[in-house]
Regions:
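Short gly/ser-rich loop at a beta-strand->alpha-helix junction or flexible surface loop bordering the NTP-binding
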Residues: 1, 11-202
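Single conserved hydrophobic/aromatic residue that forms the stacking wall/gate
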Residues: 1-16, 341-352
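A generic fold-level signal
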Residues: 4, 141, 262-264
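Short, function-defining helix-loop hinge/capping sites that tune catalysis or transport
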Residues: 115-118, 287, 320, 352
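Surface segments flanking catalytic/ligand-binding clefts of nucleic-acid enzymes
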Residues: 181, 185-343
Length: 352
C-alpha cells in the first residue's frame, strides 16, 4: 500500500511538470494566426511525443525564440505564464488568454493545470499540420484550426474563416488596421483533403459541409462579405446559392477591344448558370479615373451578355438598401423563391 501511495504521489508530481512540446490549438491557435502567419509546417517523423524521433531531429533553428520552456523540472504553472507572455508580446490581448488551448495525441496524455485547456486529438497528430514557433512550442496550422473552429465559432463565422484562409489577403481581427494583400496560403481543396483524411476527428463533418460554400481567392474582406451574402444559407441571411466563382476572368474579344483599354476583366462574384456578375465597389472607385475605367468595364461586360449588379459600401452600411440589392441579385440569378425582403415596411416590422 505504501508503494502504491508513493507511486500515486509521484504521478501527481509528474502532472505538475510540463511535457514538451506544447501544442497551441483551437481558439488560441486562431488568435496566434491572426497576429503571425508562419508558412512552413514542422515535419516530424512520428507522433508528438516520440522521444526517439525528437532526439534524432536536427537542432532547432537559431531564429526560433528561446522561451525557457526546456528548463529542467519546469512546472506547468510556470509554463502557462511563459506561453501567455509570449503570445501577448505578439499582439494578442491578455484578456483573450484567460485559458490557453493545447492539444495532445491521446486522453492518457491529458493534464489539467490551471491556465491550460487540454484537448485530445484521439490519434497521433499529423506532423505536417504543426508549425514550430518557438523552442518547445508548436501551433496547429490553419487547416486543422479551421476544423477545430466549429467548437467555438458559429457556422457563419466559420464560413467567413474558411474564406479568409483561402484568400489573397490577411485581416488581423485583433487590430484596427486595414487588411494586407498576400499570396493565397491554402486552397479549398487543401482543407477538404484534411477533412477527408480526418473524418473521424471532432468537427471534420461540419467543416466539410461549410467548405461546400467556400471559394478560393477572395482579394479583400468586402469581396468575402459579398460572396458570403450570396452563398450563405437562407436561414443565416444569405441567398443560399453556392454555385459561384470568385474573380472570374473575362478576356475581351478582339471585336470589342475598341471599347476598353483593358484586355481582360475579373468579376468579383460570378454565377455562371445565369451569367450574373456581382461587383463590390469601395471608396477607391470614387476616383475619377477609376470611375471611367469602371464605366468601360460595365459597357464591355454588358455587351458580352453579362448581367452585372454593383454593391457599394453605403449599401452594406444600410440594411434596407442591402436587402433591396440582395433582391436584385436573387432575381438576376433566378431564385424566384428567394425574394426575402419585399418592402421597407415589412422589413421595419421584422426589425421591430
Amino acid at each position: 500500500r505504501d508503494t502504491d501511495r508513493s507511486r500515486g504521489l509521484g504521478d501527481v508530481y509528474k502532472r505538475q511538470l510540463m511535457d514538451l512540446p506544447i501544442v497551441l490549438s483551437h481558439k488560441t491557435a486562431w488568435l496566434y494566426h491572426n497576429v503571425a502567419r508562419p508558412s512552413e509546417p514542422l515535419s516530424r517523423a512520428s507522433s508528438l511525443y516520440d522521444e526517439d524521433s525528437l532526439a534524432n531531429e536536427a537542432e532547432p533553428t537559431a531564429s526560433l525564440p528561446k522561451l525557457g520552456l526546456d528548463a529542467k523540472g519546469l512546472r506547468a504553472s510556470t509554463a502557462v505564464g511563459i506561453v501567455a507572455d509570449y503570445l501577448v508580446s505578439l499582439g494578442i490581448p491578455r484578456e483573450e488568454l484567460d485559458h490557453i488551448d493545447t492539444l495532445v495525441n491521446f486522453d492518457f496524455e491529458r493534464s489539467t493545470p490551471a491556465g491550460f485547456r487540454c484537448h485530445v486529438f484521439g490519434a497521433p497528430v499529423p506532423p505536417g499540420h504543426l508549425i514550430e514557433v518557438a523552442e518547445g512550442l508548436l501551433v496547429v496550422d490553419e487547416a486543422m484550426c479551421f476544423v477545430q473552429a466549429g467548437s467555438w465559432m458559429s457556422e457563419p463565422e466559420q464560413l467567413e474563416y474558411g474564406y479568409e484562409i483561402c484568400a489573397r489577403y490577411h485581416l488581423n481581427h485583433l487590430s484596427t488596421g486595414d487588411y494586407i494583400e498576400m499570396g493565397q496560403r491554402y486552397t479549398v481543396a487543401d482543407l477538404i483533403a484534411y477533412c477527408n483524411e480526418n473524418r473521424s476527428r471532432q468537427g471534420a463533418i461540419r467543416a466539410a459541409a461549410v467548405l461546400k460554400r467556400v471559394h478560393d481567392g477572395a482579394r479583400s474582406p468586402m469581396e468575402t462579405a459579398t460572396a458570403i451574402m450570396v452563398v450563405a444559407k437562407r436561414s443565416q441571411g444569405g441567398l443560399g446559392y453556392a454555385k459561384v466563382e470568385l474573380n472570374h476572368r473575362v478576356d475581351v474579344p478582339n471585336e470589342f477591344k475598341y471599347l476598353a483599354k483593358a484586355g481582360y476583366f475579373e468579376i468579383d462574384v460570378y454565377a455562371p448558370a445565369s451569367g450574373t456578375g456581382v461587383e463590390y465597389n469601395g471608396s477607391d472607385h470614387l476616383d475619377k479615373q477609376r470611375s471611367a475605367s469602371d464605366a468601360e468595364r460595365m459597357t464591355v461586360l454588358s455587351a458580352l451578355g453579362f448581367r452585372m449588379i454593383v454593391l457599394t459600401g453605403t449599401q452594406f452600411a444600410h440594411q434596407l438598401q442591402l436587402h433591396r440589392a440582395m433582391n436584385a441579385i436573387a432575381l438576376a440569378i433566378g431564385l424566384k423563391c428567394c425574394l426575402l425582403y419585399t418592402s421597407d415596411a415589412a422589413d421595419e416590422a421584422r426589425s421591430v
